[in-house]
Amino acid sequence: MALVVGLVGLSLHQPAGEAGSLSILMEPDATGVWRDLFDRFEQQNPGLGVQFVEGPPATNAREDMYSTAFLAGRGGFDVVYADVVWVPKFAAAGWLMDLTDRISVEDRQDFLPADLQGSTYRGRLYRIPALTDAGLLYYRKDLVAQPPATFADLIARAKEHQSPDRWGFVWQGKQYEGLVTCFLEIVWGHGGEWIDAETREVRLDEPAAVDALQFMVDLIGDLSPPGTSTYTEEETRTIFRSGRAVFLRNWLYVWGLMDQDGTIGRSQVGFAPMVHAPGKDSASTLGGWGFAVSRLTKDPDAAWRLVEFLTRPESLAQVRDRMGRVSARQSQVPADLLPVLLKARPRPPIPEYAQASDILQRWLSAALTRRAAPAEALSRAASETRLLLNVD
């Protein structure tokens, strides 16, 4: 049976799993599905055990735990359960094994293209996708027959159905990573960009980005609640599920919870990609999780076997059924959701992502709370980001 380890007494400076044992740090296993999968892996691999460390719920806290273990130089974990935005940092630091030649052609063809792209750094694959995520525009289809395609459509329909008891559009405006993902979808919809993935060019002070932020600022207090600059995912979901909003920007998990609570159910709700400007394309910000192999593991072949096992279709089907999560395999994605996921885009694949995101969050928040004009905020953010990336 897989050994489940709590954080109390755990040393992150211990070597990666000893012979016959593989260690992995993950989120709390509320449903027990991961424990069951680890038990099955052990049954299929006699003599090989899994030490499962249940970490804190917060993603950044687990990233810090992995980073601390790697920086100690002895790599406390053999397998890394990695957020898509960790890949560039971890790969650039030399913490992950190159898996390019280990993945099969069949698996490469089955995984969603954006999830594979987000698992790649400088042309090499360092993570095998498992669970995907993407931003969606949810709408009340009992009020709106067809989802809006453009920003003008969104504004018009939100105004049409807004009332004293119902806001037009709710989204995540607090100073945190969720604000960055919302901003990116609106920037992409305007034809703009944050940081060019190939050249590392910072494009925050271009007109498309300024127009995107101005759009967000103008929403607050008009079609979006005055408290938007304090909202995360759950605040906005609560407003929408109670029937107090026409449109909601949020992640895939909202769909899984739609019939479990609140007054609004799936029969009254539809979803679509975020809207775009005329002549531009919509895109959803990619999220999601996958598995990587530590370069410090004592048994890379065994660690790879665990990664391969956890990302098999049958394993991911169990996670889908018990957690309500969406598999990163195209063959397992619901047909109505696939078109949205095929338009998902990763965030900039740079090792300095966390620092760049912090800069952007601070200045986006300054604009949303009217402490700085959008053009000024993005000019300052662009300057700080260029200094961080050492680019002109």
Task: Identify what each model region corresponds to.
Residues 1-10, 340-392:
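Conserved C-terminal helix/tail region of periplasmic/extracytoplasmic solute-binding proteins
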Residues 84-136, 146-149, 153-157, 163, ...:
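Hinge/lid segment of periplasmic solute-binding proteins
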Residues 100-111, 173-174, 192-211, 260-263, ...:
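Short, solvent-exposed loop/beta-turn-alpha elements that line the ligand-binding surface or hinge
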Residues 124-130, 135, 153-202, 208, ...:
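Extracytoplasmic/periplasmic solute-binding protein
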Residues 157-162, 198-230, 274:
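Glycine-centered hinge/linker elements that transmit conformational signals in sensory
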Residues 253-266, 277-363:
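C-terminal lobe and pocket-closing loops
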